[in-house]
Each structure stands twice: as structure tokens, then as C-alpha cells.
Amino acid sequence: MHCPFCSAVDTKVIDSRLVGEGTQVRRRRQCVICNERFTTFEVAELVLPRVIKSNDVREPFNEEKLRSGFLKALEKRPVKSDDVEMAINHIKSQLRATGEREVPSKMIGNLVMDALKKLDKVAYIRFASVYRSFEDIREFGEEIARLQD
């Protein structure tokens, strides 16, 4: 790795440790030329699968679209933004764990519903009503009854 101070090519690692719940490696380095020390972080570059939409169109996974869906369902609900971010990261981990290059959008929708069910039941019903295209109040009642079981 190049030294950020003198641009020398040679640096040595003084210390390495896992950080960020084991998802990053923090390395303390020292330049062998100018002896300056600096810190680097290594993260695995993980690619998320492409999404197959219901009309068979394929598109890249869009984390902002996922976040937007969560935030719409959770609007004015008492859920911490950290909890939302943890749910999003968990869904991304589940998608990577499939090992598939492409996943159906329906799978992502179901993962969101599972996460919302744990985070906030009202947000779950909001999301389910749009995701499952509820037509009348009876469908709301049936979904609420399932939640109470």
C-alpha cells in the first residue's frame, strides 16, 4: 500500500484487528521510508443479486428503494432508525446468503414483511396492504387476525 504522506510503495503492518462486528479489518501501518503511521480499513466487496421483477424485468438491487419502502411503512411510528438500518442490513445478508445471482422481487417483499412484523405491527399492516393489494376492509381484518395468532 502506498504511504499517504510520502507516496512510498513500501509499508508494513504493525497491528491488525477485526472491527464492525467482524465485517472489517482495521490495520495500523507504518511507512518504511518516512516512518509515518496511518490506519486502513478492509471490507470485503460483496455483490448483491439482481432483482427479477414480476414483469420479468431484471434490475440491480437498489438499497434506497428498500429503505424507502421501510420508511413509508414506518412513517410516524416509534421505531429507531438504527433498527431500520439493522433490518436492511439483515435483508442484504439474507440475499447474499442465497448464493444466487438473481432473486425474485417477491422474495425481497417477503423479507421486508418478516422484518416489519418484528419491528412494528402497524407498519407491517401498512406494507402488507400495498404489497398484497388489499381490496377491502375484510382483507385488513384477516391479516390483523393472523397477526394476533
UniProtKB/Swiss-Prot annotation:
<keyword id="KW-0804">Transcription</keyword>
<dbReference type="InterPro" id="IPR005144">
    <property type="entry name" value="ATP-cone_dom"/>
</dbReference>
<feature type="zinc finger region">
    <location>
        <begin position="3"/>
        <end position="34"/>
    </location>
</feature>
<keyword id="KW-0678">Repressor</keyword>
<dbReference type="GO" id="GO:0008270">
    <property type="term" value="F:zinc ion binding"/>
</dbReference>
<keyword id="KW-0067">ATP-binding</keyword>
<keyword id="KW-0238">DNA-binding</keyword>
<dbReference type="GO" id="GO:0045892">
    <property type="term" value="P:negative regulation of DNA-templated transcription"/>
</dbReference>
<dbReference type="GO" id="GO:0005524">
    <property type="term" value="F:ATP binding"/>
</dbReference>
<comment type="function">
    <text>Negatively regulates transcription of bacterial ribonucleotide reductase nrd genes and operons by binding to NrdR-boxes.</text>
</comment>
<keyword id="KW-0805">Transcription regulation</keyword>
<keyword id="KW-0862">Zinc</keyword>
<keyword id="KW-0547">Nucleotide-binding</keyword>
<comment type="similarity">
    <text>Belongs to the NrdR family.</text>
</comment>
<protein>
    <recommendedName>
        <fullName>Transcriptional repressor NrdR</fullName>
    </recommendedName>
</protein>
<keyword id="KW-0863">Zinc-finger</keyword>
<dbReference type="InterPro" id="IPR003796">
    <property type="entry name" value="RNR_NrdR-like"/>
</dbReference>
<feature type="domain" description="ATP-cone">
    <location>
        <begin position="49"/>
        <end position="139"/>
    </location>
</feature>
<dbReference type="GO" id="GO:0003677">
    <property type="term" value="F:DNA binding"/>
</dbReference>
<dbReference type="InterPro" id="IPR055173">
    <property type="entry name" value="NrdR-like_N"/>
</dbReference>
<dbReference type="Pfam" id="PF22811">
    <property type="entry name" value="Zn_ribbon_NrdR"/>
</dbReference>
<dbReference type="Pfam" id="PF03477">
    <property type="entry name" value="ATP-cone"/>
</dbReference>
<keyword id="KW-0479">Metal-binding</keyword>
